[in-house]
Amino acid sequence: MAFTLYTLLQAALLCVNAVAVLHEERFLSKIGWGVDHGIGGFGEEPGMKSQLMNLIRSVRTVMRVPLIIVNSVTIVLLLLFG
């Protein structure tokens, strides 16, 4: 299998899909990455864990509709061109 731009884009799509399907109550809270209401204070930098949780929430919120469209296009292309 050749390493092409399409393969790279497909791998990126799979990674974004993996982040988008993480469920906060079923998976993330079991490993201790649930919602923390008391994170940080005034003038404190957020930690790495809170930044990763913010990234996961942002990807799930912002990328929901574009992921549906891109996944549909990818499925159609795979069905048409194998």
From Swiss-Prot:
Cellular localization per UniProt: Endoplasmic reticulum membrane
Protein name per the record: Immediate early response 3-interacting protein 1
GO BP annotations listed: brain development; endoplasmic reticulum to Golgi vesicle-mediated transport; organ growth; positive regulation of extracellular matrix constituent secretion; positive regulation of protein secretion; protein transport
Cellular component terms per the entry's GO annotation: COPII-coated ER to Golgi transport vesicle; endoplasmic reticulum membrane; Golgi membrane
Species classification: Eukaryota, Metazoa, Chordata, Craniata, Vertebrata
Transmembrane intervals: 2-22, 62-82
Family affiliation: Belongs to the YOS1 family.
Major place of residence: endoplasmic reticulum
Membrane topology qualifier: Multi-pass membrane protein
Function: Regulator of endoplasmic reticulum secretion that acts as a key determinant of brain size. Required for secretion of extracellular matrix proteins. Required for correct brain development by depositing sufficient extracellular matrix proteins for tissue integrity and the proliferation of neural progenitors. Acts as a regulator of the unfolded protein response (UPR).
InterPro entries: Yos1 (IPR013880)
Keywords: Endoplasmic reticulum, Membrane, Protein transport, Transmembrane, Transmembrane helix, Transport
Keyword Transmembrane helix set for record: yes
Keyword Electron transport: no
